[in-house]
Amino acid sequence: MSNPRVFFDMSLSGTPIGRIEMELFADTTPNTAENFRALCTGEKGMGKLGKPLHFKGSIFHRVIPGFMCQGGDFTAKNGTGGESIYGAKFKDENFIKKHTGAGILSMANSGPNTNGSQFFICTDKTSWLDGKHVVFGQVVKGLDVVKAIEKVGSDSGKTSKVVTITDCGQLS
């Protein structure tokens, strides 16, 4: 079975800026990859928090240049929420893959075994996160879109424009 590919169509304050295509590492992190894939398609319907389990319409709430772009909080939209397809937080699957450079897709968390729906895309090598955050995919097309998002970030993570996932889904 080949690894699934998913996409985000992105906008900055309502202006479309392009598509990010990502390969999910189902071969090494099947549970984490499946969570992200299903949140891209929205196929699981409503979550326990009463919000659709879907990234569509959610924002990248934290963008730090030279580090990462973080999103996936489709419940509170500020970094305090989110929900996995498994209901609760789920365990760190493994730390086989490393934060080797720009385009790495990894789970955001608040400590060990606290994965939900929040994720980040690295804009540089972030090796200090190895062993703490689960790497489960990589950008295969649209790194220029990630770099455009990075440009509206700040040292505090606050963005100068609203960074929105206007559409998302599975390609293969």
Swiss-Prot record:
Domain PPIase cyclophilin-type, which positions? 7-170
Q: Which InterPro entries match?
A: Cyclophilin-like_dom_sf, Cyclophilin-type_PPIase, Cyclophilin-type_PPIase_CS, Cyclophilin-type_PPIase_dom
Coiled coil ranges (UniProt) are none
Q: Which domain of life is it from?
A: Eukaryota
Supply the induction statement: Down-regulated by salt and cytokinin treatment.
Tissue expr = Ubiquitous, with higher levels in roots and flowers. Confined to vascular tissues. Also detected in stigmas, base of siliques and anthers.
- What EC number is given for this enzyme? 5.2.1.8
What role is this protein assigned?
PPIases accelerate the folding of proteins. It catalyzes the cis-trans isomerization of proline imidic peptide bonds in oligopeptides.
The name this protein goes by in its record: Peptidyl-prolyl cis-trans isomerase CYP18-4
Give its localization: Cytoplasm
Which BP terms from GO are recorded? protein folding; signal transduction
Does the record carry Transmembrane as a key word? Answer: no
Its Gene Ontology cellular component terms are: apoplast; chloroplast; cytosol; Golgi apparatus; plant-type vacuole; plasma membrane
Q: Does the keyword Isomerase apply?
A: yes
- What does its activity-regulation comment describe? Binds cyclosporin A (CsA). CsA mediates some of its effects via an inhibitory action on PPIase.
Catalytic activity reads: [protein]-peptidylproline (omega=180) = [protein]-peptidylproline (omega=0)
Q: Which family does it belong to?
A: Belongs to the cyclophilin-type PPIase family.
Q: Which is one GO molecular function term here?
A: peptidyl-prolyl cis-trans isomerase activity
- Subunit structure of this chain's protein: Interacts with A.tumefaciens VirD2.
Q: Which UniProt keywords apply?
A: Chaperone, Cytoplasm, Isomerase, Rotamase
Ranked from the top, the taxonomy reads: Eukaryota, Viridiplantae, Streptophyta, Embryophyta, Tracheophyta
What Pfam families does the entry give?
Pro_isomerase
Top enzyme class = isomerase
UniProt lists the gene as CYP18-4
